Amino acid sequence: MKKTLLILCCLYVVFTLQAVDKGLSNFYFSHITGENGLSQSNVKAIIQDSYGFMWFGTKNGLNRFDGTSIVQMNCDDYVVGTGNHNISALFEDKERQLWVGTDRGVYRYNPALDIFTAMNMETEEGVNMNNWVSNIVADSIGNIWIVIPDQGVFRYKDEKLYFYEVTNKEHFKTEAPDCILVRPDGDVWVGTWGGRTFSI
């Protein structure tokens, strides 16, 4: 009986592995690099927008991929005269505008007008978003949360900007905020470089 059970188990494992192997062989990966159109091969952020475009943020520009070809774009606000090409975070809001986090703050891309606008805003206390952005997310009530490790966490809503100092300046190098999670119940959690988490 034990011998028959052992043989059946071995046959099951062999046939299962063959089925898994056949399923895996149907995948095909195509590589997109600097050699075939990407502005730079160090990709730091990826998002698919509601139009179906794939966006790749690199150390040297923003790239839009339609499944066939790549269009290289620069985050240049020609009205203000600022720009940045080191892309670190991407997010699409409810108005279908792309938020682009760079190492000098946030830009918004309006696809209808095909323009970038620098988010040169300040909180009521005079704090502005002017450093490297690690993450951008939204919650269910329309707040957009922006994590800037060198500063803290910002919340944007109704054309106003609010600032949350996650940790005090003494511990900022080891406790700088880096990632953020908005739970379905609305709670906002921030993770730091030092391994701590905070609820806002």
Residues covered by each model-derived region:
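Carboxylate-rich, polar loop motifs that coordinate divalent cations or form catalytic acidic clusters
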Residues: 1-200
